[in-house]
Amino acid sequence: MSNSSKKHFDLPYRPGVGMMILNADNHIFVGKRIDTKISAWQMPQGGIVPGETPSIAAMREMLEEIGSDKGYIIAESKFWYSYDVPSFLIPKLWNGNFRGQQQRWFLIRFTGNNEDININTSNPEFDQWRWASLDELLSIIIPFKRKLYQAVVKEFESLIQ
């Protein structure tokens, strides 16, 4: 059976990491995805390369997506969080091999300044970026990731206040 004929729920999750990156004011980095016509804001995330630890993947992805690795890990999520992408997106993402992602999340303190951030990387994922408050984060996030973001916020919230 080819991946294109598999049912959505039969596909595995792609292993990955997500980063809740905080500035000195405890605002959260969000980027607007470059590959969609809708206003799709999200926190940086990415895959784990085979043999790579989640924490190493998080710092690599931070550099790849925001152009800076100026920061340090405050906390790692206790759980792996997962989300499913809408079925119409499956053939367009990851060669149709995954139903969504299962991610370890990291709370990262950004130690640089705004001038250190460069989203015009070799493989850009965002065309805009900004710092969002914890209160506004869930209202601007792409809907199919909202439940995952709620869980991540709940886990890290006491460390942000």
Swiss-Prot record:
InterPro entries: NUDIX_hydrolase-like_dom_sf, NUDIX_hydrolase_CS, NUDIX_hydrolase_dom, RppH. Its EC number is 3.6.1.-. The keyword DNA-binding does not apply. GO terms for cellular component: cytoplasm. Residues 12-154 form the Nudix hydrolase domain. The keyword Hydrolase applies. Keywords: Hydrolase, Metal-binding. Its cofactor is a divalent metal cation. It holds the Pfam family NUDIX. SUPFAM superfamilies: Nudix (SSF55811). A motif (Nudix box) lies at residues 46-67. Disulfide bonds: none annotated. It comes from the Bacteria. Gene3D superfamilies: Nucleoside Triphosphate Pyrophosphohydrolase. One of its GO terms (biological process) is mRNA catabolic process. PROSITE patterns: NUDIX, NUDIX_BOX. GO terms for molecular function: metal ion binding; mRNA 5'-diphosphatase activity. Belongs to the Nudix hydrolase family. RppH subfamily. Accelerates the degradation of transcripts by removing pyrophosphate from the 5'-end of triphosphorylated RNA, leading to a more labile monophosphorylated state that can stimulate subsequent ribonuclease cleavage. PANTHER family: M7GPPPN-MRNA HYDROLASE. This is RNA pyrophosphohydrolase. It comes from Rickettsia africae (strain ESF-5). The lineage of its organism: Bacteria, Pseudomonadati, Pseudomonadota, Alphaproteobacteria, Rickettsiales. The gene is rppH.
